[in-house]
Amino acid sequence: MLCLPXFIILLLLASPAAPNPLQTRXQSNLIRAGPEDANIKTXKRVIISGLXXSILVPLIDAIIG
């Protein structure tokens, strides 16, 4: 009988320390992955637009001139 109050106190202390549910972890991973993916896509766009500008500008100048 003396163990029951101690067991209840341990349960109350352990409940806030419980890990997040799987869905919440998956959502936080998606949120963290979003900006990284956006930076990679932006870097690819910058590289592609730089290559396109370096190729298209001389081509257009050659056609016009």
Swiss-Prot record:
Extent of the signal sequence: 1-19
Tissue distribution: Expressed by the venom duct.
GO CC annotations on file: extracellular region
Prodomain residues: 20-43
Modified residues (Isoleucine amide): 64
Broad class of where this protein is predominantly found: secreted
Domain of life: Eukaryota
GO molecular function: toxin activity
Record's subcellular location: Secreted
Keywords: Amidation, Cleavage on pair of basic residues, Neurotoxin, Secreted, Signal, Toxin
Family stated for the protein in its record: Belongs to the conotoxin T superfamily.
Note: The mature peptide does not contain cysteine residue.
Entry protein name: Conotoxin VnMLCL-031
